[in-house]
Amino acid sequence: MHFEHVAMNVPDPRAMARWYVEHLGMRIVRQVDAPPYMHFLADVTGRVVFELYANDLAAIPNYAEQHPLILHNAFAVEDMDGTIERLTAAGASVFSDETLPDGGRLAMLRDPWGIALQLTQRAVPLGA
């Protein structure tokens, strides 16, 4: 058995997919251009995949009202300040930004739809 994807019911999967491709470096690996507008997005490694869709069989959560510790998608970055600046210029907002005791840094942002994005710059990368 292996992990395949994480799915999120979102209000506008087409616009969100475009934003994630343009600003987070993801790529669309499969999409359906009819309701529920499924878009499968892979990260640069191809190992992590998000499915975005707007399925009216279930409620779309109000992500902006959820605390980011309930659900967030984390991205490792090389240039924390530059990435925060670039994403906020593209419509994201900063929720928190902290330096850890080991020198690593974590920033929590929200994308334009309110979904929490964590930016990580770890002193010791996961899996190292």
What are these regions (language model features)?
Residues 1-17, 70-75, 123-128:
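N-terminal beta-strand motif that seeds the catalytic metal site of vicinal oxygen chelate
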Residues 36-38, 57-63, 127-128:
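A short, acidic/glycine-rich surface segment
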Residues 40, 84-128:
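Vicinal oxygen chelate
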Residues 8-50:
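Core segments of cupin and vicinal oxygen chelate
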Residues 31, 53-58, 121-124:
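Acetyl-CoA-dependent GNAT
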Residues 69-87:
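Mid-chain, well-packed structural core segment of small domains
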Residues 35, 69, 103:
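Exposed loop/turn and edge beta-strand positions of beta-sandwich/beta-sheet ligand-binding modules
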